[in-house]
Swiss-Prot record:
Belongs to the serine-aspartate repeat-containing protein (SDr) family. Residues 1091-1101, 1118-1134, 1142-1164, 1172-1320 have a biased composition (Acidic residues). PROSITE patterns: GRAM_POS_ANCHORING. Residues 130-145, 174-183 have a biased composition (Basic and acidic residues). GO terms for biological process: cell adhesion. It is found in: Secreted, Cell wall. Residues 1-35 form the signal peptide. One of its GO terms (cellular component) is extracellular region. NCBIfam families: LPXTG_anchor, MSCRAMM_SdrD, YSIRK_signal. This is Serine-aspartate repeat-containing protein D. It comes from Staphylococcus aureus (strain USA300). Cell surface-associated calcium-binding protein which plays an important role in adhesion and pathogenesis. Mediates interactions with components of the extracellular matrix such as host DSG1 to promote bacterial adhesion to host cells. Contributes to the resistance to killing by innate immune components such as neutrophils present in blood and thus attenuates bacterial clearance.
Amino acid sequence: MLNRENKTAITRKGMVSNRLNKFSIRKYTVGTASILVGTTLIFGLGNQEAKAAESTNKELNEATTSASDNQSSDKVDMQQLNQEDNTKNDNQKEMVSSQGNETTSNGNKLIEKESVQSTTGNKVEVSTAKSDEQASPKSTNEDLNTKQTISNQEALQPDLQENKSVVNVQPTNEENKKVDAKTESTTLNVKSDAIKSNDETLVDNNSNSNNENNADIILPKSTAPKRLNTRMRIAAVQPSSTEAKNVNDLITSNTTLTVVDADKNNKIVPAQDYLSLKSQITVDDKVKSGDYFTIKYSDTVQVYGLNPEDIKNIGDIKDPNNGETIATAKHDTANNLITYTFTDYVDRFNSVQMGINYSIYMDADTIPVSKNDVEFNVTIGNTTTKTTANIQYPDYVVNEKNSIGSAFTETVSHVGNKENPGYYKQTIYVNPSENSLTNAKLKVQAYHSSYPNNIGQINKDVTDIKIYQVPKGYTLNKGYDVNTKELTDVTNQYLQKITYGDNNSAVIDFGNADSAYVVMVNTKFQYTNSESPTLVQMATLSSTGNKSVSTGNALGFTNNQSGGAGQEVYKIGNYVWEDTNKNGVQELGEKGVGNVTVTVFDNNTNTKVGEAVTKEDGSYLIPNLPNGDYRVEFSNLPKGYEVTPSKQGNNEELDSNGLSSVITVNGKDNLSADLGIYKPKYNLGDYVWEDTNKNGIQDQDEKGISGVTVTLKDENGNVLKTVTTDADGKYKFTDLDNGNYKVEFTTPEGYTPTTVTSGSDIEKDSNGLTTTGVINGADNMTLDSGFYKTPKYNLGNYVWEDTNKDGKQDSTEKGISGVTVTLKNENGEVLQTTKTDKDGKYQFTGLENGTYKVEFETPSGYTPTQVGSGTDEGIDSNGTSTTGVIKDKDNDTIDSGFYKPTYNLGDYVWEDTNKNGVQDKDEKGISGVTVTLKDENDKVLKTVTTDENGKYQFTDLNNGTYKVEFETPSGYTPTSVTSGNDTEKDSNGLTTTGVIKDADNMTLDSGFYKTPKYSLGDYVWYDSNKDGKQDSTEKGIKDVKVTLLNEKGEVIGTTKTDENGKYCFDNLDSGKYKVIFEKPAGLTQTGTNTTEDDKDADGGEVDVTITDHDDFTLDNGYYEEETSDSDSDSDSDSDSDRDSDSDSDSDSDSDSDSDSDSDSDSDSDSDRDSDSDSDSDSDSDSDSDSDSDSDSDSDSDSDSDSDSDSDSDSDSDSDSDSDSDSDSDSDSDSDSDSDSDSDSDSDSDSDSDSDSDSDSDSDSDSDSDSDSDSDSDSDSDSDSDSDSDSDSDSDSDSDSDSDSDSDSDSDSDSDSDSDSDSDSDAGKHTPVKPMSTTKDHHNKAKALPETGNENSGSNNATLFGGLFAALGSLLLFGRRKKQNK
């Protein structure tokens, strides 16, 4: 910080003397409550500007997080700036913040980091091995009353070194002039910001006068120059080499490369800390103009910071005494190389030495993350210097799920340039932790109340914001060196979501975000011509449900320096200065005096050998003097000045020689001829002290009070000067004329003035707050003022959770943190606000006697406990608002207790035996029922089970809305919901909502009744008349197997009918079931669904639905099949049918009349061939054939009329067919059809029907004697027939007939089995057996749809069956023909 009155640098220790010609602005960490930017201006020797050491305030090292969503955790870094003059760019290096914000209760605290270079040794040295080294000027603390124009301004006096002269003869005056033109240098080259005063001296700071970035520097007259002690040897000017040559081997250097932990926190961070490069370089005299040497640095090093234009800061090396350029710099940043090319300076001077002192930086691009043992190296000439460091980046600022980090990554500032003030870039990492955030918003603001001179700005006219999405799992560079090619540019997605606001801010609405983002803010500086502008920019991330978090960055300035000098010979000179303290010694802050005449005489001849007039800075130089003794005389002193004492101290270069003195030149320059003069002035002041015993007298052990403001006024009350007391309580007003003055002391905070004019010693007493001082030809150092500390006390104690609600602090009860406590005065004005710490403690400090009001804010979810319980006010609760009195001691009795109110929710689960949905007196609870409690978002909170009485309860619940779910107990059904008007007696169902509002809720009940069970069953009877109805004379069939399947087809029960044909399945729930009756051996399924549901047959498989009642309607009937021989004849007919022959055969069938009908059927047979469609017709025919036929037809139905053919063969036959059907009951489906039956044939097999066919053996039927033969055949026939049946499918009718003949054969079941094979054939044409029906929930039978059944029977069986069938047909056909005749 620049103290503009005294122009002194303020460090953490207070005032320091001006020490280093180096311009720097230091970096500070900024707190959340207030931000101070401290800047220290120091001017450097060389024209090179070293960037500021990157440092953060270690004292402010912890991110502050707030307790509410509208408060944020701020973290701001003060990044160092390198401010240039009005036409130059600022050199800035960013500082990533350590995590720190700190606020103090007694105002804004500024803590300054150490300067990058802070010793008096940072200057160019010129020396040879033969030199008589001159002592450098002594640095002493400036008198605090001295007003300075430049802070930290060192008396500019380089070390002067000796060189032997090349020429030993005394030069002529003309020669002297020539040498002067070449070698005289009386100005200083200082590269820094331009600072102007009323008196200005122009100093060239760069050899390239056309470079607008290297503007001239104007130093005020008050700046003391370096003593021009440089002793140079004039070299014969030699032509420079025609060819540039690398002279690294002719350069020797003594180099140190040091890692500087700027904030001394033992953590090295590229953006905070830096490298100090110091080197003393000696140039061999063989080096010529145009030769060059190099400085090579490793890829972990960078030579400039944030400002790309700052590369010039490590630039040309100049002689600070005369401004001449020694070597010019050229940068090759791509190869990390600086090339220095020598000018003709090295041709004209011997033994050139150069010193460089640079601050260089760690390159975050090559150090993206924390890493140990990172190497940094610099090679000057052929000498490499190395060092290593453990790099440790700071963490991001995190608060709950919010996380953020930021840094300035580029700044170009043109101070004083209205048209192009420059720009800066800030890089912000949003949500680097990659948490899922809701309603995430980023606010960027170039404003902070503690920085009224902030030159940052954000608005839509000058600001460009880029937004990049970071891939999941991507590692961001912790030095904020971002490779955007590896990220996704999503700027266009957010163009409409960026809102610019007042006060230089912009808000970006990210919405719901679960990835990290990089936001780059590129904006312009505001115009400024301030010598110490500040740049502060904040970034705050907020999201729903999380506390906001903030970070920020700020900047400061500094310079690098370099320089060199050759050595020249034989000059006399130095300096005339104003010795303000009249001690005869040159000291810092004492300025030169111009226009004083200096005349030099040869002391032996009294001949005048030179004359000069001091320049504005007080310097002079008279060159080209040979060895000898010379008399130096000063004249033409400014009016009113007197000569200071001579020969003071032991340093001839700093003392005064008086108006006339004799000095000797002996093989080297003599630059010690100085003169000190002063204008008589007087001082007024003394001391401000702490009067600890309050007696009004300065006692020996009482100490001064620093920082007290003292104001000097003239007799008319006009303010002349204002100072503050130093660390010892001293103050002084200087440069005062004789007269009367008024002195006023400002009472320091926390103090009270002591008594006035106690005792008789005016130098020891207190003059009070206002006094008069007189100066009369002498200093007046008697004006003192004493103060004693105003007594201060504390008030506070404790906020605790009163778990037992008794209003008293128990030993097991703990404090509540984060409770806001407010202190007010008696008038109700807020004095202080604080929050309880982690232990519930709070305290207000620094309070005077008085009455105060203390208010406690009730923490969320708590209720204040009872007040004033018991007699011990140290442990009771004072409530949420109370009064506290301080009377000469602390008051630590003001406490407040709170408790968390919690409630219960629950009631009862009961068995509602009467199912009325209301708890009746005699109904009991159900134990073991699982009850689940959920919050409004369906998150399970607790689960309990009802106790032995059906009771349940959830405890320790806060106010809110909850969901309660009851699990239906096994064997029960939920009762009706919300019956009646009594909410405490009704059932709330399986799921209900319960609200707790400052009371228990014990109304959530649920009722269940036992789930009823049902029975299913009825009767299996012998349907002797085959009419499909249960007649009173028909009896049940015993031991019929009945199987019960559930809806999934799983067997859940098996039983057998009792001796009366009855069966029953019990304990069934409502639902869908299937009942399967196993057909008794030798019986045939009777017709189904022929009459009322409780009297008919339901078939072999029945689907049934039980809905809240028993079902005793599931019956089934069977009968025994009859046989007929003549049928076999008809079979033969059927043969002819089979021929499908010609219907004429079927005509012959017509003999058997109806057969003829059936013939026609048979015709249809042929149709049947075309397809069993006609068979279906034939069915009807078959019907016509005979009822019994029709039975078989019903078989044949499925069978496609082939049956009907067979029917047509003979009605009875068709019966027999039905026999055979029964065999191939399939036949019953028109036999072979039934062969599809054959599947059922397998029935028929089981029928062994064939046995009954063996009836058909009775086929002996003579009908076909041959039949009977065929019977034996029939066996095979049966097979083959059946097979043929299947063949005959189209014919199958007649086949099936023949089958039916041979059916009996098919009796050989096994054949029939083979039938079933053929059946499979037949199956292709025949319908599935009609034994399965479906019942709806009304218990009405529904016919099942017909489906084909394909069997894998033997093809050979089919073939043989076909052949036998054909043979049988021919025989029968021939026989019938004979009969017809």
